[in-house]
Amino acid sequence: MTDVLFEKRADGVALITLNRPDSLNAMSDELVVLLGEYLEECERDRAVRCVALTGAGRGFCAGGDVRGMQSRNEQSGEAGQERSNPVTVLDRLTAGLRRSHDATTLRLHTMAKPTVALVNGVAVGAGLSLCLGADIRIVSERARFGTAFRNVGLSGDFGGTYLLPRLVGMGRAREMYFTAEIIDAAKALEIGLVNRVVAHDELLTRGLEFCAKLASGPTAAFGRMKENLNFGETATLDALLDQEALLMRISGLSVDSREAVRAFMEKREPEFQGI
């Protein structure tokens, strides 16, 4: 059984399902590699116009695989004993983790098309970070969220310390990291962590309907919106206005923009191609 399922749908939505239900989709090495490969394929494939990410079974993602962590720690210790310079071992392990971050959370956050996390259950630790990387979070009423890192004596990874404060504020983010409190779907909606809460049995249906609506839209413009929004997270207003002006003019020259103008004049709905 593969750790990640991948489906390209006729409506332009790619559905990626984390598929280790017996462990609440905890992140094995294989899962991280496959997820990164499928996200890269989605980014390259123009036929994919929206990406949906969910989990099989009762959980979205329970974060890192603790058994795998123990094995890696043992291997790291052995490698450290074999090498004269333990800093080299740390550098290698750090670089490997960074590659995992780039292939997953960063790609979800930056790819030039909408990404939607359909959170069906628990999303904690790196699993929380992963769903925060998506543009939009639609969650089951049974979803639960937490940072969890304190419980295993770790500081956090997969971009959570960057993304969480931008959604819930720095004070609440610090509290969530320091306490590892688990919050339910209603609380997550209240504090701005998620966008929508739906009935558990309707999550996939309603989530994919939402994704299909995005996929039928001007996805090239969505990509430029994301570029502006991401740039604005760290830029000055002056710099962002330059960026907006440039991308606005580029968007105005696009096939989709010209189609939208024609459709308006002809009193019909536009048929966007994502270009």
Segments (PLM) and residue ranges:
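Crotonase-fold acyl-CoA enzyme core
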Residues: 106-222, 249-262, 268, 275
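Glycine- (often His-adjacent) and acidic-residue-rich active-site loop
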Residues: 55-107, 153
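Terminal peptide-recognition signature
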Residues: 16, 20, 34-35, 53, ...
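Short, charged, surface-exposed hinge/linker loops at domain edges
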Residues: 226-235
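Charged catalytic carboxylate motif
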Residues: 30-34, 100, 107, 206, ...
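Conserved CoA-thioester-binding segment of acyl-CoA-metabolizing enzymes
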Residues: 1-56, 70
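Localized chelating/binding microdomains
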Residues: 93, 151, 233, 247
